[in-house]
A protein has these predicted regions:
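Basic, amphipathic N-terminal segments
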Residues: 1-278
Length: 278
């Protein structure tokens, strides 16, 4: 709270996006180097918070602190990082959803969720211009909505992909992703995301699906976190240079809100008890 107030003034709660990043340690490290070590990183009006595995025991103290940090809306969103070549089975989805439901109970707030797929490349694309790549789903999305939103990505992936390949033949990420989605990838995603849609469950709002190359972060974030005490000044230990790949989620945060969990039931119970006692 003191750090954010010092950086963004007393009104930081209206300016700053708070995002919880979940998944296995290796996947999170690939997407946000140093996040596990630092536990949180801040920059560009965005705070990324380490959430760890959704199947692990949850840190109740952390979520209690988050609930107090910004009452009413403790998080703007939750990102579930998916490793390369990961098979999203119904069992994995069920485990994820149960973990997210538990976090919602601890926060008393169900935040929008983005799934973030890390993609591989057989050669380095570190100099490729980065941009946010993904699709947003409407509230209470159905399978047809997933298909439609992913299909809407294809023209831009093709146009931008051709432009990047023309500049550098090794920068083929967008072109290959578009071809993958066109050649059955969209249908597979629509089928794999069925457990996340409103027809299957109501408690976890799936907002979108993002894609990026693994380890594609800006070089400014590649700090020697293994020995942070020696290499990073105290004032910069939680500094984040937010990559352009995050801009889609950050820009989407003001357009979508989560919902409170449990509060209406608790208030109703309190009223009933007051009537009985009074």
């Amino acid at each position: 709270n003191k750090h954010l107030r010092r950086r963004y003034s007393f009104f930081w709660r209206h300016k700053v996006r708070l995002l919880l990043v979940t998944g296995d340690e290796a996947a999170i490290e690939q997407l946000v180097p140093g996040l596990q070590e630092s536990q949180w990183l801040e920059g560009n009006c965005t705070v990324l918070i380490y959430g760890g595995s959704l199947t692990a025991e949850h840190d109740t103290e952390k979520y209690a602190a988050l609930r107090k940090l910004r009452r009413g809306r403790p998080l703007d969103g939750i990102v579930r990082v998916i490793p390369q070549s990961f098979n999203l089975t119904p069992q994995v989805s069920d485990n994820d959803l149960r973990g997210l439901e538990k976090i919602s109970e601890l926060l008393r707030y169900s935040a929008p969720v983005w799934r973030w797929q890390l993609c591989s490349s057989h050669w380095s694309q570190g100099t490729r211009p980065e941009q946010a790549v993904g699709a947003s789903f409407p509230p209470r999305a159905k399978e047809d909505d997933v298909i439609r939103q992913l299909e809407l990505m294809l023209p831009a992936l093709r146009a931008q992909g051709m432009s990047q390949v023309a500049e550098n033949s090794s920068h083929d990420f967008l072109l290959r992703l578009g071809q993958h989605l066109k050649d059955g990838g969209i249908a597979r995603w629509a089928q794999q995301l069925v457990p996340w849609l409103s027809a299957s469950q109501q408690r976890v709002p799936l907002r979108g699906l993002m894609f990026s190359l693994s380890g594609s972060q800006s070089p400014e974030n590649a700090v020697a976190y293994t020995d942070a005490e020696n290499y990073v000044p105290e004032s910069q230990r939680h500094a984040l240079t937010l990559p352009a790949t995050w801009q889609g989620i950050v820009d989407d945060c003001p357009r979508v809100r989560g919902r409170r969990v449990g509060m209406a039931w608790e208030q109703t119970l309190a009223w009933i008890l007051m009537i009985i006692i009074g």
